[in-house]
C-alpha cells in the first residue's frame, strides 16, 4: 500500500516536471501541452517574474531535469551528430561547472550569498525552464523527433544552441567557480562606457530597462525593430540582457558608434544572415547551391561567441566555412566580394552593397610616458617596437587584455592556431588599430603640436639662426613625408602619424660626432638639417614609425639631462708638420679631398675607446673598411656599439638582423654615424695622414699609430670636436706598393664598392 502511494506521488511529481505547470495536468494530452507552451510564450513576452532564491535544493532539482534531457537525447534513434552544438557534451559540462561553483561556496554564509546573487538566480531559473521545454519537446514530438528534417528536430537544435550559449555565459561570469560578473571586462571601450554609465557594476538587467537606456543613446525606431533586436542580443532567451551577451553583441556589430545601423544592414535586411544555425545546417543549406560558385551565408559562431562564421561555395563546388579575424563582418564581406568568394547571399543574385558602412575609424593614440621611455631605454629598446619580432612598430591592441603588438605577428600567431594572447593567454575577443606616440624628452615641456605649428607663421625667423632654419627644414620634410603617405595606396597607417608631434633639431654643438662641412660657406645646412630631422630620414622600414627611423638591433640612447649646457669647445691643437705625418686622400674623378675623420686612421691602429684598459684593435678588410677585433668598451657604465653604416662591416659578435636599406640613424633628434647610449665625448682628432691610394709608407705609419694611441689616452672629460685640418696630397717617395681597391666618397666617409671576399691587413 505504501509502495503504491509512493509510486503514485513520484508519477505525479514527474508529470508536474514534464508539464511545467499544474500537478494535475496530463502531459499525454497534446492539446493541453500546446496551451501550456502558448502560456509560456505569453509569459515570456509580458516579462520575467520575480526570481526565487537559488538554493542548493533548487540547483539539485535542475540537475535532475538536465539528466533527464541527456537520457532522452541518448536514444539511438536520434542519431545525433557529434558536432557543435552537441547537447550530450553541453549539459554534462554545465553540470560540472555548477558543481564547481557550489564547491567554492560550500559554507552556509557563502551559499546564502550565492543563492541571493541576482545573476545566479536568473540563470538557474532559465536553465530549469529550458530543460523542461526540451523534455516537453520530446513528449510532444514523439516519432517526429527522429526525423532530421522535422520542425521538432529543428527546435531541439535551437535548444542545443541556447544551452551552449548558457554554458559559455556561466563560465564567463563564474570563471573557476568564483563570481566575477561585477568585474567582467567588456571588449570595446565605448560599449563598456555605455554599460558603466547606465548599469554600473550590474551583471544582468531586464530587457525593458536595457531597451530604454539604449534608446537614449541610439534610437530604436519601432516596436518591431525592438523585438528583432531582442532576438539578436538575448542569446539565452530569458528576457534579460547580461553583460556577457551585451559584449558579444558589441563585438559582432562593431563599431559602437553605428552599431544599430550595422545591425540593420547585416542582421535585418541582409539575405545572407542566418540566426541560430549550426555548422551542419549551413552545409545542408548551401548544398543546393553547390553549382553556383560564390553563394554564401553567415551566422554567429557557436564555438567562438562574438565572431562570425561565413559558409560559401568554392569554384570546385566545395562548401567551406571560415571565421574572419581582426576585421568587422561588413569589411570581410566587402573584401570577399571583391575577391569573388561572397557573391550570392543564400543563392540570390542581389548582393547588398555594404560600402556605406565603411567609415574611417579614428585610431587610438597611446602616448609613451617618461617612465616607460626610461625603462625601455635601460633595456636597450623602445616602447613602440613590437617585442615579438623586434622589427615593426606596435599597431594593434588585443582586447580586452590590452597588450600591443604588430599586425603581422598577430596574424602569424592566429594562423598558427595560437590560443589567446601571446603574452597573457587571455582570450582574444577583438582587436583595435592603435598608434604609439613615442616619448620625446625635447618636447616634454611643449604643448603645441604639429597641427598648431602649421597654423602659426613659420617665416618670422632670423636667417642667421641655425635652430630656426633647421626647424623650417624639418617642417617642410614632415609635410612632404605626410603627402607621400597620403598618396600611398596603403589605407591603414602602421605607425605614428607626423601630425602628433614636432621635434626641434638639436644644436650642432651638442652633437660633435656629426659630419661637419669641410670649408665655409656652409651651404649644406639644408641637407644636414634634413638629415638630422627625425621625420626626413628615407632609410626607415615602410612598417616602422616615420619619426623613428632606426635599426632594430641597437638600443636607444639614454635621455639627456634637461637644460644642460655643453662646455665650450677647446682650442684646436696646432697643426702637425707635413714631414711627421702621413695623409690619406681619395682617388676619384674629381679628386675631391675628404674630411679628416679619424676613421681611416683607426683602420690600422690600436686605440682605447673608453680610456680604460681594454684596447680595441682595428684592421682593414678587403673593401678597405675598418673592422674591430675586440670591442668591450664601456661608455658611462654601458656598452657602446660599433658603427653599422652601409660601407662598414658589422662587429663580430653582433649577429642580430638589420635592414640593408638603413644607412642613417636618428635617435631622439640625434643623428650620426656611430650610436651611443649617451651623447658621446670624442677624443682629440689624430694627426691627419696622407697616403696614396696605391702606396703606403710603413715607417711613417708606425709614428702615426703612436700619435693616435697617445691622443686616445688624453683626458676625455673635456668637450672635443672633430678637427678640420687641411688635407695634404703630397707623397713620400720611399714607399711600398700595395694592391689598390676602388673606393667611393660619400658624406666624407670612405666606402668600398667591392665585395666582402677577403681581408687585407696592413703590417708595420
From Swiss-Prot:
* Residue numbers binding 4-O-phospho-L-tyrosine: 299
Q: Where is this region: Linker?
A: 357-385
Family matches, as CDD domains: RING-HC_Cbl, SH2_Cbl-b_TKB
Q: What are the start and end residues of every segment in region (SH2-like)?
A: 254-356
One Pfam family in the UniProt entry: Cbl_N
- Reaction it catalyzes: S-ubiquitinyl-[E2 ubiquitin-conjugating enzyme]-L-cysteine + [acceptor protein]-L-lysine = [E2 ubiquitin-conjugating enzyme]-L-cysteine + N(6)-ubiquitinyl-[acceptor protein]-L-lysine
Gene Ontology terms, cellular component aspect? cytoplasm; membrane raft; plasma membrane
SMART domains referenced in this protein's UniProt entry, alphabetically: RING (SM00184)
Query: In which broad location class does this protein mainly occur, judging by the first location in its UniProt entry?
Result: cytoplasm
- Keywords attached to this entry: Calcium, Cytoplasm, Immunity, Metal-binding, Repeat, Transferase, Ubl conjugation pathway, Zinc, Zinc-finger
Q: Where is this region: Disordered?
A: 1-27, 482-583, 707-726
Q: What does this protein do?
A: E3 ubiquitin-protein ligase which accepts ubiquitin from specific E2 ubiquitin-conjugating enzymes, and transfers it to substrates, generally promoting their degradation by the proteasome.
What binding partners and quaternary form does the record give? Interacts with several SH3 domain-containing proteins and with poly-ubiquitinated proteins.
The further comment given in this record reads: This protein has one functional calcium-binding site.
According to UniProt, the name of this protein is E3 ubiquitin-protein ligase CBL-B-B
